[in-house]
Amino acid sequence: NNNAVSEEIADALHDASDHLPVYMDVWFDDITYSDQGIVISEIMANPGSVSDSYGEWFEIVNTTDSTIDLQGWSIKDLDGDEHELYSDQASILISPDEYFVLAKNNDQSLNGGVEVDYVYEGYSLSNSDDEVILLDASGSVVDEVHYSNGWPFSSGVSMEIHDPLIDNALIGSWFSSTSSYGNGDMG
């Protein structure tokens, strides 16, 4: 009994297949996406000059013409790491065309020399296979990057996109960073 697709589609799949029978379960997660204009633009998952616990960071950029308040937004991955952006001040603002660095540590003498706009806790970047998922205050996905081995980063080298308006979900959109900063990492 087929309740998932129309009989016409089931018949077409049946007729097209040389490996009968064909059974398939398809489901879609209840995910809401939001076009807020904030893009993940650079990721330092594996710092070389300091430990991961001090030197991990990622960068976002506001591609809109409006200032956006990040208060109440969240970062997470699929392994359960999650952090809600919060400030004792009323807002966490990112101006139009502004780049904004989120990191585990803002002490430049400990984090490899990167200038940080916001410090997070409870969230880590794997050195080989992970996700950076950015959600707005309502829980809608604003942007996400799923990276793995083969993406253009290595120990001490972040990966970046050169154009924040291209699809940053594609490996071909990312490049190894070539600018040295702080203690010698590239980012």
Q: What do the PLM-derived regions correspond to, one by one?
A:
Residues 29-171, 183-184:
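Activation on beta-sandwich/Ig-like modules and their edge loops
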Residues 1-32, 132, 144-147:
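Metal-dependent phosphoester-hydrolase catalytic domains
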Residues 11-27, 170-187:
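Surface beta-loop-beta hairpin patches that serve as ligand-binding interfaces in beta-rich domains
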